[in-house]
Amino acid sequence: MAKIFTISLGCSKNLTDTEEMLGILNHKKHYLVADESEADTILINTCAFIKPAREEADREIKRASKLKAQGKIEKLIVAGCLTQKEGKSLPSKYPLVDAFIGLKGIEKIDNVIKRPKHSFCPAPDYIKAPDFKLQLTAPHSAYLKVADGCNNRCAYCTIPAIRGPFRSKSMEDIVAEAKAMEKNGVKEISLIAQDTTAYGQDIFGKPSLVKLLKKLVKIKGIEWFRIMYAYPETVTKDLLDFIACEPKICRYLDMPLQHISAPVLKAMNRRSTEDEVRAKIKLIRQIVPGMSLRTNFIAGFPGETAEDFEKLKKFIAEAKFNNVGVFAYSKEDGTPAAVMKRQVAEKIKKQRVEELVSAQSRVIDSINRKLKGKTVKVLLDNLFCGRSESDSPDIDGRVEVKGNKKYKAGDFVKVKITSAKGYNRTGKII
């Protein structure tokens, strides 16, 4: 059997694909090694969403190809979104790769390892619970993919072309996955998809995330469910009402907005207008006081004027988001935005990213001043550090704890905040 070292690139949705492949390989009795020097096979699961992701994949493939050329590994397999996006152009670019497999190849990874063969297929038009899964996150926190693909057509985005149409898992499959996670000691589940709040649209004819959540919160051992990748259009009053009354749903919402200026939103082909976005944020905070909001913004979208940018910067200051990710616009071939006129210069994009990050830093400083002396519930990731409801794994802040003598990773504790700087807070267990 192969000795396999795995490299998983990209987002949490990609990570769940890696977990599925490793679950299959583990079931088939392959050896999964944590030290690359012990491997005879390297499996790279790639991301291709934007240029920096493709550049990272390129570096890893070339590095692994060098190891193969030196005789340090026998096989090199490349999976995921890069294969799905660029397909048959890849073998000539990376001749030492034994097999490129797209998203449909995940289920056949055992056969690919044994008998390497390229597999270029359209994106799947279905989604089901994985037969096997090997969790790669901390034992107490896991990602659960409730849907895949996307029916939105944002002008800058390649995801629909890579991942295919939006399709939801059955509720029965999701609940079964969550129960299996509970059995393995998971305390926190982050629900993920390309468009999580649209869950069930394809099955029931309307978004049905609340219906799913009502089933999930009955699972006794899971204390936190976290909603990631929400679209403002499908963040409904019913969903907010349920979050407000159900303690197992984190008062946290990851809702990428991308911009606020009306001309830019229209050019992006976003479904919500400026007024609708502002109204939705107001509604969220009315129904769920204290809700932590995370969002993403794109700086330097084609046609973004200085006036558009200043409006976005002012919006960040006004909206007071708890967490903000800022990205320079990435020109993606095949998207409407790639051929738009008035492309913004790279130098200006970089400057605008820096200004938005600075604007958000000032917001965080004001939020932090109000945190001192407050008591928050924290899920410990290790003996000295954990996360509050406001902190998603890997991408948000953390809470450093003092006075921990009897608690372990996976325990929930109450922490009194004593200081805060940036996205990191410090407190004492009480």
From Swiss-Prot:
Residues 136-368 form the Radical SAM core domain. Residues 369-430 form the TRAM domain. One of its GO terms (biological process) is tRNA modification. [4Fe-4S] cluster 1 binds at residues 11, 47, 81. GO terms for cellular component: cytosol. GO terms for molecular function: 4 iron, 4 sulfur cluster binding; aspartic acid methylthiotransferase activity; metal ion binding; protein methylthiotransferase activity. [4Fe-4S] cluster 2 binds at residues 150, 154, 157. It is found in: Cytoplasm. Its EC number is 2.8.4.4. Binds 2 [4Fe-4S] clusters. One cluster is coordinated with 3 cysteines and an exchangeable S-adenosyl-L-methionine. The keyword tRNA-binding does not apply. Catalyzes the methylthiolation of an aspartic acid residue of ribosomal protein uS12. This is Ribosomal protein uS12 methylthiotransferase RimO. It comes from Elusimicrobium minutum (strain Pei191). The lineage of its organism: Bacteria, Pseudomonadati, Elusimicrobiota, Elusimicrobia, Elusimicrobiales.
